């Protein structure tokens, strides 16, 4: 509620979530009737970015001070390891010690449908980084990215078919390697390789070729095999993973 509910409750109900009103109290602004009417339903679609999944554990809520932040009010610690020492899925980024959980996109889409009346949704970002230090050949052979994209697209298709979630578009992040805020050029997210010394020098990566086939429909028959390979590769990692 302190993440999505913070803006979705006003947009759909004209008020902040009850838990926020209870915990934050007078520090949380209130909508008057005119404002509530104005903001309710004032969106055309939702653009959702999905990358990783974290566990949440209780954390004492500190008394407000000059260094207090909005996220402190939630009273939780976010972590990639659960109480059994398990990680949610395959490694997302080694340097950040983060992990991804493909099935999480299924739960998030279903949650938004159930909680907020099945709004129109576009997945505006979904992708995985690889080290910027890799040479051209290493960067182009990005089978890890195929694993990531295929597994998430499989669960996205599944939730659309099973739950009727109103997802109308999906954008893989990103079309080409790019400058990342906070990371600069030290990571690569692209389906295409970009030579930073010559921006006209670009090559489609293996993930880009796979994505082309997927969009054109020629990868549908191999999607199950790709997804199986993704699952097997995650299970073969040394770190202990939680059940999917």
Curated annotation (Swiss-Prot):
Stored InterPro entries: Glyco_hydro_1, Glyco_hydro_1_AS, Glycoside_hydrolase_SF
EC number: 3.2.1.147
Hydrolase in keyword set: yes
UniProt binding sites for substrate: 51, 173, 180-181
Record keyword Hydrolase present: yes
Signal peptide range in chain numbering: none
Compartments (UniProt record): Vacuole
SUPFAM superfamilies registered for this protein in UniProt: (Trans)glycosidases
Active site feature: 125 (nucleophile)
Tissue: In vacuoles called myrosin grains of a certain class of cells, myrosin cells, distributed in the cotyledons and the axis of the embryo as well as in different organs of the growing plant.
Sites where a glycan is attached: 32, 216
Transmembrane segments: none
Gene Ontology BP terms: carbohydrate metabolic process
PROSITE patterns, alphabetized: GLYCOSYL_HYDROL_F1_1 (PS00572)
Reaction catalyzed: a thioglucoside + H2O = a sugar + a thiol
Major location (coarse): other
Annotated coiled-coil segments of the chain: none
One Gene Ontology molecular-function label: beta-glucosidase activity
Family: Belongs to the glycosyl hydrolase 1 family.
Subunit structure: Homodimer.
Function summary: Degradation of glucosinolates (glucose residue linked by a thioglucoside bound to an amino acid derivative) to glucose, sulfate and any of the products: thiocyanates, isothiocyanates, nitriles, epithionitriles or oxazolidine-2-thiones.
Protein name per UniProt: Myrosinase MB1
Organism (species): Sinapis alba (White mustard)
Species lineage: Eukaryota, Viridiplantae, Streptophyta, Embryophyta, Tracheophyta
